[in-house]
């Protein structure tokens, strides 16, 4: 219920799944509430959560398996990250592409979007897993 979400929740985190779990991509109808115009809660999508957000807002996915630690370049300040090179942990099969989101960070090797924000709403996405190596991002979002 969209009204209940607005009344009961302060912020929303949509987390990822295991590499083999692609069921969320086949059940996007469960996430259509993300586009509800009156939903004014900050949302953070992590890995599969970023992919879901991108698809719900009309984006696409490309196959892009990345596993392990890599360095990504932040172009602008994003939650707790300053513009700089940062080491993050990746574990995904797909990358998300969406023109309604600004790219704040990308992987250097493939130019894959790693941190995005909706251009007009407080909706963020990260393809990497901050719960593994960059917990301060989650803490900053939750404050």
Task: Briefly describe each language-model feature range.
Residues 55-123, 128-136:
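Pocket-forming structural segment of enzyme catalytic cores
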Residues 28-33, 61-62, 105-107, 141-143:
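Glycine-rich, phosphate-binding/catalytic loops in enzymes
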Residues 49-50:
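Catalytic nucleophile loop
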Residues 5, 130-143:
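RNA-binding accessory domains that recognize and position tRNA/RNA substrates
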Residues 1-45, 57:
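Flexible gly/pro-rich beta->alpha loop and the following alpha-helix that scaffold active-site loops
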Residues 43, 64, 119, 141-142:
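Residue-level detector of intrinsically disordered/flexible regions characterized by low predicted structural confidence
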């Amino acid at each position: 219920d969209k009204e209940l979400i607005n009344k009961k929740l302060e912020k929303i985190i949509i987390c990822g799944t295991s590499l083999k779990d692609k069921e969320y991509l086949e059940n996007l109808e469960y996430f259509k509430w993300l586009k509800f115009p009156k939903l004014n809660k900050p949302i953070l999508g992590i890995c599969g959560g970023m992919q879901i957000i991108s698809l719900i807002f009309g984006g696409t996915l490309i196959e892009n398996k990345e596993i392990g630690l890599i360095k990504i370049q932040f172009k602008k300040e994003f939650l707790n990250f300053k513009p700089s090179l940062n080491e993050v942990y990746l574990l995904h099969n797909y990358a998300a592409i969406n023109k309604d989101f600004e790219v704040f960070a990308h992987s250097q090797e493939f130019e894959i979007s790693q941190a995005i924000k909706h251009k007009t709403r407080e909706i963020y996405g990260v393809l990497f897993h901050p719960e593994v190596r960059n917990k301060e991002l989650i803490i900053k979002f939750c404050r």
